Amino acid sequence: MRLHKIFYALFENRLSDNLEELVQGKKAVESPTAFLLGGQPGSGKTSLRSAIFEETQGNVIVIDNDTFKQQHPNFDELVKLYEKDVVKHVTPYSNRMTEAIISRLSDKGYNLVIEGTGRTTDVPIQTATMLQAKGYETKMYVMAVPKINSYLGTIERYETMYADDPMTARATPKQAHDIAVKNLPTNLETLHKTGLFSDIRLYNREGVKLYSSLETPSISPKETLERELNRKISGKEIQPTLERIEQKMVQNQHQETPEFKAIQQKMESLQPPTPPIPKTPKLPGI
């Protein structure tokens, strides 16, 4: 029981510090908006913030679950125990912190950005319903990125994090990425049908808006998203990314991993075929 009280006190202290830091330079508004973000792992959801900052003139608070994972009071000990699998052991803590922060800040009416993936519909529906009860307008902005690009994005992110700190680098299994890709279009269609979101938008990595339910309310986002997820990428487009990842993996000494071998195979497949060496014609009498 005493340990529970200590943990609760540590959590409340950290929550207080997080709230104080997040509200710096931000103002509560009379008619607040919450932006829920979606997109498969590696799609680059951070880039959605640019459009939102422009829309709110920067008066918005970003709540990113990942930033709270290392705040777990036993994080260092858990890293030693579980190494790169530590994420799943600290996620319950970061989820609790995220929920507490959303609750406290929404009570006061701050504009919010809430990161997610869109793997399920339950969480966005519950969040949007709760926020609307507090007077919020709710919107959903989703990354529409070809699945090969986002999968490579998960590998590059891991290699970059590994170079910085091998013990806390966050790996995304390909299966988790592919499940998100498979479910996202249907989930987004379900969310569109609920009518909970005043606007559902799709953006690519360049920040170009590909779809808005506000502009085309009778059209589901599913078709546009599926088309972009399955869009074929040319070798010219993908080669710089492959070369960049290969270089990082060599630096991290990850040449023996299945991912490295797959990257090399893909790069080899992009090389133009070697033309056959022409045969030297035989001279008469030789």
From Swiss-Prot:
Disulfide bonds: none annotated. Coiled coil: none annotated. Residues 272-286 have a biased composition (Pro residues). Keywords: ATP-binding, Kinase, Nucleotide-binding, Plasmid, Toxin-antitoxin system, Transferase. The keyword Nucleotide-binding applies. It catalyses: UDP-N-acetyl-alpha-D-glucosamine + ATP = UDP-N-acetyl-alpha-D-glucosamine 3'-phosphate + ADP + H(+). The keyword Signal does not apply. GO terms for molecular function: ATP binding; kinase activity. Its EC number is 2.7.1.176. Residues 249-286 are annotated as: Disordered. ATP binds at G39, Q40, P41, G42, S43, G44, K45, T46. It is an enzyme of class 2 (transferase). It holds the Pfam family Zeta_toxin. In the presence of the epsilon antitoxin, forms an inactive PezA(2)PezT(2) heterotetramer. Toxic component of a type II toxin-antitoxin (TA) system. Phosphorylates UDP-N-acetyl-D-glucosamine (UNAG) on the 3'-hydroxyl group of the N-acetyl-D-glucosamine moiety, yielding UNAG-3P. UNAG-3P inhibits MurA, the first committed step in cell wall synthesis, which is then blocked. Phosphorylation is inhibited by cognate epsilon antitoxin. Part of a postsegregational killing (PSK) system involved in the killing of plasmid-free cells. The zeta toxin induces programmed cell death. Belongs to the zeta toxin family. This is Toxin zeta.
